[in-house]
């Protein structure tokens, strides 16, 4: 085992009891915590129960619906309630091969189960008999460690890594939850089905460890976990995350405005939820833009101005996105935005210049794979409500 000491950099931590009125009370694009976390009481309780009972869990929803925030909230509550429970989280966003996956998994498990770097070194010596990892760590136990393996060795003996959490849990009398975000990225690995078989063959035998797997590519996650021919079929409790209802958004928005000494009319809060289609990311972003424009009281007119500014702000992104769509895909989107329901009917095909019913099927599948459309039980919807608004009113000019 090789150990490299990383130069320690100062870490400044700040605490606060109350937000100043100059700081926005809305959060998006990062993990929501404490007062930023919105509702999800039932889902949180369900997830905490699964963690405490070591039930494998698969969480599926479109992008930016708050999966990561929900998992972080449930993990925090579960650890607070159970002194023997440890949660380790890894994100596969930038992980594109098995080698990187094994390194990330090892780092995650070691950090979650050791409070001192001496414990990390001890665990490596105890649980890695056939592998010789290279470890880089800081003298500060709160700082990151990094692990590297000889890929030739790992290919021959991946068992030690895949069983590491289970062995540590048995040794220390712990329960461990391994949370893996962007899990669908394993589909990009070499021979992904074989890799999935390897993961399941190990993980299904673990008795002191459970896995929470989630990701932002809904259609890919569905294929991995609901396809009877795939290794992870029926691996655990399958949860489909729903949107937060407008009834829950309204009191949240009013309270967040009130916390900074401002007010928002009920009609304005309703308008934010409607324009954002109750999409968690966009509700928070539109609320923030409305808050910026509010001196004392936010009105529906304030929200309308904020929405127009947000659409304009994102228009260049939407232009680039639409430029990468085919004419047939755009024609299908226009039909959907125009309220057409029988997309393969002769009248709709002719009206919108769609070549054939087969073209509808191909375009629909392509748009789902591009994360533009979502198909829930045959009902098509846009994953991005602001993009849908821009397409309808600015691009197609549908009135």
Enumerate the language-model features and the residues they cover.
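A short, basic N-terminal segment
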Residues: 1-62, 80-83, 386, 399
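C-terminal leucine-rich, beta-strand-based interaction scaffolds used for sensing/assembly
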Residues: 10, 14-24, 312-399
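Short, conserved phosphate/pyrophosphate- and ester-handling motifs at nucleotide-, phospho-/glycolipid
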Residues: 40, 68, 279, 384
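P-loop NTPase nucleotide-binding core
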Residues: 62-65, 69-177, 192, 209, ...
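Alpha-helical DNA-recognition elements
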Residues: 77, 289, 366
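Sensor-1/coupling segment of RecA-like P-loop NTPase cores
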Residues: 170-172, 176-179, 185-191, 197-229, ...
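Conserved AAA+ ATPase "SRH/arginine-finger" region at the nucleotide-binding site
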Residues: 237-248
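Amphipathic alpha-helical "lid/sensor" segments that cap RecA-like P-loop NTPase cores
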Residues: 250, 254-316, 377
């Amino acid at each position: 085992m090789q150990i490299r000491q990383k130069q320690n950099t100062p870490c400044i931590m700040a605490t606060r009891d109350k937000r100043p009125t100059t700081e926005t009370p809305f959060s998006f694009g990062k993990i929501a915590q404490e007062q930023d976390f919105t509702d999800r009481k039932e889902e949180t309780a369900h997830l905490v129960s699964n963690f405490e009972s070591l039930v494998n869990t698969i969480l599926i929803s479109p992008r930016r619906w708050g999966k990561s925030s929900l998992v972080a909230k449930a993990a925090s509550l579960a650890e607070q309630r159970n002194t023997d429970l440890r949660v380790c989280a890894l994100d596969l966003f930038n992980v594109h091969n098995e080698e990187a996956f094994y390194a990330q998994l090892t780092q995650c498990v070691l950090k979650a189960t050791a409070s001192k770097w001496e414990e990390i070194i001890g665990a490596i010596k105890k649980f890695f008999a056939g592998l010789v990892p290279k470890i880089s760590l800081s003298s500060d136990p709160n700082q990151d460690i990094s692990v590297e393996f000889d890929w030739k060795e790992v290919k021959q003996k991946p068992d030690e890594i895949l069983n590491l959490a289970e062995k540590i849990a048995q040794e220390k009398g712990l329960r461990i939850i391994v949370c893996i975000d962007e899990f669908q990225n394993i589909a990009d690995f070499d021979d992904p089905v074989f890799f999935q078989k390897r993961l399941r063959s190990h993980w299904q035998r673990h008795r002191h460890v459970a896995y929470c797997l989630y990701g932002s590519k809904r259609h890919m996650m569905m294929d991995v976990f609901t396809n009877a021919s795939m290794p992870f079929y029926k691996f655990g409790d399958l949860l489909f995350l729903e949107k937060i209802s407008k009834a829950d958004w309204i009191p949240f928005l009013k309270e967040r405005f009130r916390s900074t000494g401002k007010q928002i009319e009920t009609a304005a809060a309703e308008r934010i939820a409607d324009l954002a289609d109750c999409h968690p990311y966009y509700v928070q972003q539109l609320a923030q833009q409305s808050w910026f424009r509010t001196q004392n009281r936010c009105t529906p007119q304030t929200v309308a101005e904020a929405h127009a500014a947000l659409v304009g702000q994102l228009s260049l992104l939407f232009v680039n996105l639409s430029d990468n769509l085919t004419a047939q895909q755009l024609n299908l989107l226009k039909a959907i935005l125009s309220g057409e329901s029988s997309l393969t009917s002769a009248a709709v095909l002719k009206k919108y210049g769609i070549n054939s019913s087969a073209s509808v099927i191909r375009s629909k599948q392509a748009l789902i794979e591009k994360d533009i459309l979502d198909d829930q039980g045959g009902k098509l919807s846009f994953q991005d409500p602001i993009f849908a608004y821009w397409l309808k009113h600015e691009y197609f000019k549908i009135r």
